[in-house]
Amino acid sequence: MYDFKREGFPGFPLGQKIEFYERKLPGSRMVVTDLPGTDRSIRTLHSRLALEGSEHSSIACQLGEGDLVSLIEISGADGDKLSFEGLPLAGLSAEELVAQLRERGIAAEVGSVTVELPKLNISFFFFEDVPRTIAWQTSEAF
């Protein structure tokens, strides 16, 4: 079982530049999108990440210097082998995940398709009431 931690993307602590991810993720693809009417752009790094023998889609997005968002797809065939801070994610609805997190002393809120951990800057995205993606973001990101 792979256990995700609050400190960030596995093996990629928050606060790193997107180039750090690019060097460590073989076969990654960078996409740069200019934001109309501004002098800013979003850099998005798409890659596959192996976690204990299974591959997961991963994305790192950077807007500006210090604002990084990292996402990992957690659904799929091996979704029953993933956990967050020791809490198995398989079979948990958004409401059940919030209840379990709160029992562990982690502040959590249910959104329309998310479970937000505002003090940790972590979000779980749900589709059909199944956790599909986990995202970590630096506090500057949003």
Identify the role of each PLM range.
Residues M1-F142:
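Short helix/turn-capping signatures at newly exposed starts of structured segments
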